[in-house]
Amino acid sequence: MPYLFKSATFITLDPAAVGRADLRIEGGRVAERAAQLEPRAGEEVIDLSGKIIMPGMVCAHTHLYSALARGMPAPPRLPANFKEILELIWWRLDRALDEETIYWSALVGALEAARAGTTCLFDHHASPSHITRSLQIVRAAMEKVGLRGVLCYEVTNRGGRRRRDAGLEENRAFLAWAGQSPAPAPADRSQQDTAMHEIPATFRGMVGAHASFTLSDASLEVCAELMREFDVGLHIHVAEDLIDVEDARARYDSGVIERLAKRGALNGRTILAHGTHLGDRDIEIAREAGAWFAHNPRSNMNNQVGYAPLAKFSDKILLGTDGIGADMFEEARFAFFKSREMRLGWGADEWRRVLAANQRLASGVFGLELGSLDSGSVADLIVLDYAAPTPLVAENLAWHLIFGMNSAAVESVMVNGQFVIRQRRSVLDDEDLYSAARQASERLWAKLREM
């Protein structure tokens, strides 16, 4: 259905802009933005007087599979370091996931992301006991909520060669399904695959990998081959903890990013999550390749791994949550306050630009104009019930983002021109959904207790 939003205060992050206009939404896009637009036949008119409309938020690094971890059974003992956090908590959780719990984790995580005003997720998935078609399970859950997603499966050597190869194949299958394979060249290649389903409007893939310290050179090389085959980037954790840096130096006499570059697993579409302990040479290599750095401040604080050298990164800094929900208003606020504590010298405006970089990343992956309200841009939008107690103008927009706006103000969410949340109500039956999720989590937790 086409919509006409009347009397809206609109904001965009890049460029920072605040204005007042009507917006016509048609065919999944902003068809027109102007003052005093006249309603057309068949159009639903929605009065947004006193409300703010803006492009939806993007989360550049998350793990939907952790959504049912909230309140999970305590590990056998208290982890003493980051490696033990992985071994005693997260690697046990991902091994316990099955088809049902993958689905409910993704569904709950996607719904809570939508309620926070996040319309696109870059999800990094792992479920070593149920690898094949796991990305389609995540996709189905996200699609039910109505979100946009860029998915990948975590390739690692942790489970041996068979599971590594299954992870690679899962990435390959999803990339092919998402229509990201190059145009068929050989004359005998069947065209049936592309005719089987319409190329999805709201899903894309990347090649996923865990981290340098759980990947052999051979594994990095096959990841690189897949990246070249589908012309996509790698989504990987780098130097989150010193263990990653020390392992690369001890076993390969190399920096973490240097290893990726040597094996061909680094390009301008790559997402390097964390980067907490990257040295100058590795940062230089990443910058020369044009790779993206995904900062995850709340996760870094929670895991006590340190603070990333953000001032040395390029302007391709992103913001992620590493699985702690997908509330980008909250993550940006934590990022701002932590940067102040670390005396980084950044104000609120730098974090406005980082949030805008997330939208720019998504625009590049989808080949669409996201993060804009111009005519022709994709209608991934959120409506905020935010009453500014002080003037709201382009020059102080960032300060309102950090000190005023929050996910509690999100009233409506639209993805690809369709409402996902409307007047704070989702398109789903939330009560039944959460009841089913609780049952699934109890079964998941029972598995954890047996490990």
Where are these regions (language model features)?
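His/Asp/Glu-enriched, well-ordered alpha-helical/loop segment
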Residues: 262-265, 269, 309-388, 405
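Histidine-centered catalytic micro-motifs
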Residues: 56-67, 125, 233-242
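Histidine/acidic-residue-rich catalytic or RNA/ligand-binding cores of hydrolases
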Residues: 72, 242-254, 282-287, 304-314, ...
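Active-site microenvironment of metallo-dependent hydrolases
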Residues: 1-21, 26, 31, 36, ...
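Metal-coordinating catalytic core of metallo-dependent amide/deamination hydrolases
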Residues: 130-277
